[in-house]
Regions:
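Active-site acidic/histidine proton-transfer and metal-coordination neighborhood
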Residues: 1-73, 83
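Histidine-acidic metal/acid-base catalytic patches
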Residues: 37, 54-76, 80-160
Length: 160
């Protein structure tokens, strides 16, 4: 299940962290009882989601550690984190234990995973496989060409 941190609305990182913790301490026990994993999505606040709180991997990783439950993880959105911080493969290798789900999308533009964008998805998919990830990678992009063809190409690109 995907959840979100909400927007900053003028509050600092520490206050935002405490607000998220307060809410998650109430919600996560329900998820644990139902055997559901909550994945808080990392989004960029630079281009698409101005003011979003959980916009950097280190902030999200710290939140996961503070919540302290196997039923709370991060959704690592590769497109968004490329915009915010880059260094995608190193981050995946370093923090994979707290990533419960992945989203793809070409950057720039959030379009197809092709040679018009800056991310090497074959290498990224290999890194995700190398760390033993057994969950899902969802293709979340806006195709400029035929959607089914674009999806098929994205799936093929990420098979390692």
């Amino acid at each position: 299940m995907i959840c979100f941190s909400g927007n900053r609305r003028g509050i600092d990182d520490r206050t935002g962290m405490n607000n998220c913790l307060k809410a998650l301490k109430q919600i996560v026990p329900v998820a644990e009882k139902a055997n559901v994993i909550l994945n808080m999505e990392l989004l960029n606040s630079k281009v698409d989601h101005h003011d979003y709180m959980c916009d950097r991997s280190p902030w999200g990783v710290e939140l996961v550690k503070r919540v302290g439950s196997d039923n709370f993880k991060l959704l690592y959105d590769i497109y968004h984190m490329q915009i915010m911080e880059g260094d995608v493969i190193r981050t995946i290798r370093q923090d994979h234990a707290v990533f419960g789900h992945y989203h793809t999308g070409g950057n720039p533009g959030r379009n197809e995973l092709d040679d018009t964008q800056e991310l090497n998805y074959k290498a990224i998919a290999r890194a995700i496989a190398d760390v033993g990830f057994q969950g899902y990678m969802a293709h979340e992009f806006i195709p400029l060409r035929d959607p089914l063809t674009s999806l098929g190409e994205a799936v093929e690109l990420c098979v390692v």
